[in-house]
Each structure stands twice: as C-alpha cells, then as structure tokens.
From Swiss-Prot:
Its main location: membrane. It comes from Rickettsia prowazekii (strain Madrid E). It is a single-pass membrane protein. The keyword Transmembrane applies. Pfam families: DUF3576. One of its GO terms (cellular component) is membrane. Keywords: Membrane, Transmembrane, Transmembrane helix. This is Uncharacterized protein RP420.
Length: 167
C-alpha cells in the first residue's frame, strides 16, 4: 500500500513538473502574433452608452473601490449588523435583519462596489427577503424594489460626501 501511495505521489509530481515546463515552452508563431495584437475595443473597452462617459473626477486615488461609495454604503446600512466586510474587494454583507414593526419579515443585504468611480455601474445591491410562515423562514419571491432604491440612496450619499470633501 505504501508503494502505491509513493508511486501516486511521484506521478503527481511529474504531472505538475510537466505542466510548469509546458507553460514556459515557446509558443508557435501564430500564437505569438495573437499575443501581440491589441484589443479591437481599445484600452478603455467597449462603450455601449457613448453619451454616458464615466466622470473620472470622482475616481478614488490608489484604490480599486471608490471610498465615497464605500463610506456612503456603510453609513446608509449602519443600523443593520454586518456579517462580512471586505474593503479591498468592495463587498459588504449584512446579517439577517427584522424591523421592529414587522417581526415576520426579515432581509439580508449584499453590496458590491465594483469600480473606483461614482456611477450607477459601480454599485450592485442584492436584497434577500424572507417571510415567516408556519414557524419557518421562506424566501419571498415577490421582492420589492428596495435594492434599486438603496442603490440610488447610496449613489446620492456618495455624491454628497464627494462634494463636501472637495469644498
């Protein structure tokens, strides 16, 4: 049995070695040509809405996540306990929260900040709603437009924070 495990281990090491060496192997002429060709979309990528170009003035320096969006998102959901926060990745996840006015309803919010510029494309909010039925939490399929309203509120707050910071 030990010989079989040892042989298996050696085979895995050989496969890893071969894959590392194959990565470094010179490419064919056609592959080299494709590597040298630039993107047809250019450096900025494709612009699907030419009239809506990102305003680079709100760009956060040295970050991949816009600090104004980040601060606004945290301030707006400050009443809900946080489950996970990743400032480098731009992810905010809350715990389940039930308003005092309706204890048979709860929701959880996931916020993703995906860009370093304040824009509607830079933020994504997902809200999961559950309703208490027969003493069990059931996912509410008829979700409200709360996510869109929250995105809008975060964008407005981020804009206000930005305007106050440049004064």
């Amino acid at each position: 049995m030990k010989k079989i495990i040892g042989l298996f281990f050696i085979i895995i090491l050989i496969v890893i070695n071969i894959s590392i060496l194959a990565y470094d192997y010179p490419k064919a002429e056609q592959e080299q040509k494709w590597d040298e060709v630039d993107s047809i979309a250019g450096e900025g990528g494709l612009i699907f809405r030419p009239g809506r170009v990102k305003n680079e003035s709100t760009k956060a320096v040295g970050c991949t996540v816009n600090k104004y969006l980040w601060q606004a998102a945290l301030e707006i959901i400050s009443f809900i306990p946080l489950a996970s926060v990743d400032s480098n990745g731009g992810v905010i996840i809350t715990e389940w929260y039930s308003p005092r006015s309706n204890t048979n309803f709860r929701f959880k919010i996931n916020i993703f900040i995906k860009d370093d510029v304040i824009s509607p494309d830079a933020i994504e909010v997902k809200i999961f709603e559950e309703i208490l039925k027969n003493k069990q939490w059931v996912l509410n399929e008829n979700t409200s437009n709360l996510a869109i309203m929250l995105e809008d509120k975060i964008l407005r707050k981020a804009r206000d924070i930005y305007i106050n910071s440049v004064r």
